[in-house]
Amino acid sequence: MSLPPIGSVLIVGSGLIGASIGMALRTRGMTVWLEDADEDALRVAVERGAGLIGPPDRDPDLVIVAVPPVVAPSVIAASLHRYLNATVSDVASTKARLQREVEALGADVERFVPGHPLAGREVSGPAAARADLFADRVWALTPGPRTDAERTAAVAAVVESLGAVVVRTSP
């Protein structure tokens, strides 16, 4: 299998991290859609240029789940079930348990590339988002034993395009 370059991204969660990812990707010419249960956060993120209101009109190449860790497993699994060809990554701070929970939900973990940017600010929400938030920051990728290597490389390329330094580690 040879994956085409990632050109379209759906970000689920438009807080500080999700909106910052969207802003950075859009400055690099990517098509970005946003989804968020919080309509106010979504509106602010769209106004700040983080992306277009989703869902996308076609399957995205990449889904980035940027929601609180407590709901991340179910949102990741739902994304893997909904977008059958997309690679799915996340930004949650916990990894080993999250990966077990995603797998227990019957999701295709070969397409799941867990990640966590070591970046943030003293303020939260999409109003505080910055396109340069990830510049020179470590972004850990923690692929599981069944994660597809090409998908991991594709996510690493996107992360590096944000100016982040990719570190691959175990969950």
Tell what function each PLM region has:
Residues L133-P171:
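Internal alpha-helical scaffold of NAD(P)-dependent oxidoreductase catalytic cores
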